[in-house]
From Swiss-Prot:
Annotated gene: gcvP
Protein purpose: The glycine cleavage system catalyzes the degradation of glycine. The P protein binds the alpha-amino group of glycine through its pyridoxal phosphate cofactor; CO(2) is released and the remaining methylamine moiety is then transferred to the lipoamide cofactor of the H protein.
Cofactor: pyridoxal 5'-phosphate
GO cellular component: cytosol; glycine cleavage complex
Record family assignment: Belongs to the GcvP family.
Protein's name in the database: Glycine dehydrogenase (decarboxylating)
Record's signal peptide: none
Catalytic activity: N(6)-[(R)-lipoyl]-L-lysyl-[glycine-cleavage complex H protein] + glycine + H(+) = N(6)-[(R)-S(8)-aminomethyldihydrolipoyl]-L-lysyl-[glycine-cleavage complex H protein] + CO2
Subunit text: The glycine cleavage system is composed of four proteins: P, T, L and H.
GO biological process assignments: glycine decarboxylation via glycine cleavage system
Molecular function GO terms recorded: glycine binding; glycine dehydrogenase (decarboxylating) activity; pyridoxal phosphate binding
NCBIfam families: gcvP, PRK00451.1, PRK04366.1
N6-(pyridoxal phosphate)lysine: modified positions: K702
């Protein structure tokens, strides 16, 4: 007699089960610890009943990992990979395989967080230091930042920098008519809310009579023309204005640098240094400035300091410029940048070195010169005889026919009216050049035409100064050396591949391998953002699905995928609110209410759209003070534009009165911007659009699994209710029929499109039920950590039923009074236990905010809690007088191999006590490469790039 087959347990093998850390047995034990009978009961105790969604979240049925990859293959097949010679700041490039495998596909690099804890971030800080050095060398300027979001927003940031810093105090800014069109569009978006006038024209003819605070010139121009900008720069300086050059990095290896030409600021994209076009991104933009402007530079800057032993150590420098400290007075609202892409670009330069980069540039220029010679022979004279890689010709009535012939050979050309633009790159072959000639009606031989080609870089613009002279750009020529260098840097850092990263408000969850796989497929990575839409059909199917799913999750009616960071999403959402009020004849509504606990990007973003920030107080429980809100809403009723509020709150609690908050603001004519940074506590349980919010951004690099990349890339799409949908960001590449009244906030129409594949696969794999379960376990994990730590470090905020949301704030501040222990001491001591610190001093100074996410297992949560409890015992030893805080392992943390190998150990605690604290493994210990970094020294002695090799020679003498 046979035994019937048992029914299959799909949950045991589903992706959701692998994404979610705690097992069913773990969940039962954790519920017992937190004092709840079930997950459902815990949710009822955590979320206000007034906001719970009435029906379960319904998406498509969850797929297996194999099925999801098959689905992505089908989508990829709908995209057509042509050879795109469109230009406009996007180029084909070749990512060295050693970089693809060991950075882009390596979780040691892509799962790390922003390097606010420098001791455990030395690898990527060195890589970013290399990036800054590369940018300084190529631009000929003194200080560079560690990346911006894209070239268009970098130009806008440079415009704002010029307005702050120029001697001229006008409200007008000059833009060369030959900048990239998308850059001009982003500049228009940024300038209008601030009341700045853009003067767009020919700098030769139109700059003389213009009174401006700055000017932007493209170098080379978007047309390809290479023109000497020195006279234009001199005109700007004579007016007290700052001169900005948007410069092509590869071109700068063979043409004069912006610094040599007299520019004050240089901006651009590092995309063509090994980073695929990705249908628009992500790519690292750059900005470099002369020394006098360094303290106004937006974004992050890596500087060189020293550690506790006096050894060199990298850190983020001049952080007082940034939004998390300066708020509405910050130099920018930028938070997430493009660290992973900056690292790739820097390593591209390390891999090739200066000679390799010059060889690539000369090859590209040679092919362009040969192309131009052939076009002349065919009767199409280039518009300019001076160019680097792009040739522009007048095609007249033949334009459509030429484009059709090119497309029949799977080649895309750029078009501007009746003019055609052919932009070459390092992937361009002689066969491609011959195919372009055929599109223009000629059968020419590359070899025959090559002899007729002439150098198109004018002698006065040829680069004379050396670059990339530091040894790091010369020491890794072989793949063996390059591989080992990348491994050495990765080993210095602590990322999710080693341990839990319990950062509050950051949602450092699992980035599953399957989600990352399609990212490097050419069908997704090799598309130019301005190809004909028919060539990107797979992308647009994915976009439509994502927009639909995000609407179902959030309760909104429309979604824009364009914002390429959370801060950009905030900006786009506030622009939508501003546009809505203006369309109703209420453009005078400019007051934005922001709770005192808000993230620093909120007030910075409000300032950027021309709003005035009015701070609303919070009560002793961390909730918005309703009385204060009512008073300020009434006081500013006639001018009230919006409130920006985070939900659950930045204090880690679901506020009971969120509906009341929304109603109060709506009653006074305002709109509700609900910051989606904490959406990981809501998916499947509550929908912002249902309880009163009008607009939110979604941090796809938090809730929806795009990895943080060590500080970017990120994506911040926004969802809006129907009345705000007409005011979502537009783009000149997609707006021909119905232009949006709000311009673009990003250079590409769909932002960093290629990484949307990650969030898309995550949703495919999880389905509605899996996403809801992830939310529930994220909340359970946070309450479990709170329950375990509360007897040792009091949990500062809970709701009326004693629950936290998906994160909790613990309060060590009394310990500073009793024994001098600081939050910094605890954070650095956690490194000795193998952990990244929780979020420090936000939103409450001197506290720690912990967010475990749903991906961490009970075992890892216990390891973290055990470490925190052990640290509390060490603090007790200080309180009891065993040693002073200055002599304790807390103040000497983190401990390094230099400490354990110190022959002169003279501390009052044992070497093993410092280096191998209670509960840590001696076989698998993470050793940070430097001791505690001296922040004050680093800012007082600012070094932001590698010194040139000549400095080493002088030192040797």
């Amino acid at each position: 007699m046979t035994t019937p087959l048992k029914p299959l347990d799909d949950a045991a093998t589903s992706f959701a089960r692998r994404h979610i850390g705690p097992s069913p047995r773990d969940v039962a034990a954790m519920l017992e610890t937190v004092g709840a009978k079930s997950v459902a009961e815990l949710m009822a105790q955590t979320l206000p009943g007034t906001i719970r969604q009435a029906t379960p979240l319904t998406l498509e049925p969850a797929l297996s990992e194999v099925e999801a990859i098959g689905h992505m293959r089908a989508l990829a097949a709908q995209n057509q990979v042509f050879t795109s010679l469109i230009g406009q700041g996007y180029s084909g490039t070749i990512m060295p395989a050693v970089i693809q495998r060991n950075i882009l596909e390596n979780p040691a690099w892509y799962t790390a967080y922003t390097p606010y804890q420098p001791e455990i971030s030395q690898g990527r800080l060195e890589a970013l230091f290399n990036f800054q050095t590369m940018i300084c060398d190529l631009t000929g300027l003194d200080v560079a930042n560690a990346s911006l979001l894209d070239e268009g927003t970098a130009a806008a940031e440079a415009m704002a920098l010029a307005e702050r810093s120029a001697r001229a105090k006008t409200k007008a800014f000059f833009v060369d008519r030959n900048v990239h069109p998308q850059t001009l569009a982003v500049l228009r978006t940024r300038a209008e809310p601030l009341g700045w006038q853009l003067i767009v024209g020919d700098p030769v003819k139109d700059l003389d009579g213009a009174e401006v605070f700055g000017g932007l010139l493209q170098y080379p121009e978007t047309t390809g023309a290479l023109r000497d900008p020195r006279a234009d720069i001199a005109k700007l300086h004579d007016k007290g204005a700052l001169a900005i050059l948007a410069a092509d990095l590869l071109a700068l290896t063979v043409i004069a640098s912006p610094g040599e030409l007299g520019a004050d600021i240089a901006i651009g994209s590092a995309q063509r240094f090994g980073v695929p076009m990705g249908y628009g991104g992500p790519h690292a933009a750059y900005m470099a400035v002369r020394d006098a402007l360094k303290r106004s530079l937006p974004g992050r800057i890596v500087g060189l300091s020293v550690d506790s032993r006096g050894a060199p150590a990298y850190r983020l420098a001049l952080q007082t410029r940034e939004q998390h400290i300066r708020r509405e007075k910050a130099t920018s609202n930028i938070c997430t940048a493009q660290v992973l892409l900056a690292v790739i670009a820097a390593m591209y330069a390390v891999y090739h070195g200066p000679d390799g980069l010059k060889s690539i540039a000369r090859t590209v220029h040679r092919r362009a010169a040969v192309l131009a010679a052939g076009l002349r022979k065919l009767g199409f004279a280039p518009a300019s005889d001076s160019f680097f890689d792009t040739v522009l010709v007048e095609a007249g009535a033949n334009c459509d026919e030429i484009i059709a012939r090119a497309e029949s050979q799977r080649i895309n050309l750029g078009r501007d009216g009746s003019r055609l633009r052919i932009a070459l790159d390092e992937t361009t072959t002689a066969d491609v050049v011959e195919a372009v000639w055929r599109a223009f009606g000629g059968e020419l031989s590359y070899a025959a035409i090559e002899a007729e080609a002439r150098d198109a870089v004018p002698a006065e613009l040829k680069r004379q100064r050396p670059f990339l002279t530091h040894p790091v750009f010369h020491a890794h020529r072989s793949e063996t050396e390059m591989l080992r260098y990348l491994r050495k840097l990765a080993d210095r850092d602590l990322a999710l591949d080693r341990a839990m990263i319990p950062l509050g408000s950051c949602t450092m969850k699992l980035n599953a391998t399957t989600e990352m796989i399609p990212l490097t497929w050419p069908e997704f990575s090799s598309l130019h953002p301005f190809v004909p839409r028919a060539q990107a059909a797979g992308y647009h199917t994915m976009f439509a699905d994502l927009q639909d799913w995000l609407c179902r999750i959030s309760g909104y009616d429309a979604v824009s995928l364009q914002p390429n960071s959370g801060a950009q999403g905030e900006y786009a959402g506030l622009l939508a609110i501003r546009g809505y009020h203006a369309a109703r004849g209420e453009g005078h509504r400019t007051i934005c209410l922001i709770p005192s606990s808000a993230h620093g990007t909120n007030p910075a973003s409000a300032h950027m759209v021309g709003m005035e920030v009015v701070v609303v107080g919070c009560d002793s429980n961390g909730n918005v003070d309703l009385a204060d809100l009512k008073a300020k809403a009434e006081l500013h009723s006639a001018k009230l534009a919006a409130i920006m509020i985070t939900y659950p709150s930045t204090h880690g609690v679901f506020e009971e009165h969120i509906r009341d908050i929304c109603d109060i603001v709506h009653a006074h004519g305002g709109q509700v911007y609900l910051d989606g940074a904490n959406l990981n506590a809501q998916v499947g349980l509550s929908r912002p659009g249902d309880y009163g919010a009008d607009v939110s951004h979604f941090n796809l690099h938090k809730t929806f699994c795009i990895p943080h990349g060590g500080g970017g890339p990120g994506m911040g799409p926004i969802g809006v209710k129907a009345h705000l949908a007409p005011f979502l960001p537009g783009h000149p590449a997609t707006d021909a029929a119905t232009p949006s009244p709000v311009g673009p906030v990003s250079a590409a129409p769909y932002g960093s499109a290629s990484i949307l594949t990650i969030s898309y696969i995550y949703m495919l794999l999880m389905g509605g039920e899996g996403l809801t379960r992830a939310t529930e376990i994220a909340i359970l994990n946070a309450n479990y950590v709170a329950a375990r730590l509360d007897p040792h470090f009091p949990v500062l905020y809970r709701n009326e039923r004693g629950r936290v949301a998906h994160e909790c704030i613990i309060d060590p501040r009394p310990l500073k009074q009793t024994c001098g222990v600081t939050v910094d001491d605890i954070a650095k001591r956690l490194i000795d236990y193998g952990f990244h610190a929780p979020t420090m001093s936000f939103p409450v100074a001197g506290t720690l905010m912990i967010e475990p996410t749903e991906s961490e297992s009970k075992a890892e949560l216990d390891r973290f809690c055990d470490a925190m409890i052990a640290i509390r015992k060490e603090i007790a030893a200080v309180e009891q007088g065993r040693f002073t805080i200055e002599a304790s392992p807390l103040r000497h943390a983190p401990h390094t191999v230099h400490d354990i190998a110190d022959d002169d150990w003279n501390r009052v605690y044992r070497r093993s006590e410092g280096c191998f604290p209670e509960g840590t493994s001696r076989t698998d210990k993470y050793w940070c490469p430097v001791g505690r970094v001296d922040n004050v020294y680093g800012d007082r002695n600012l070094v932001c790039s590698c010194p040139p090799i000549g400095d080493y020679a002088q030192a040797a003498e």
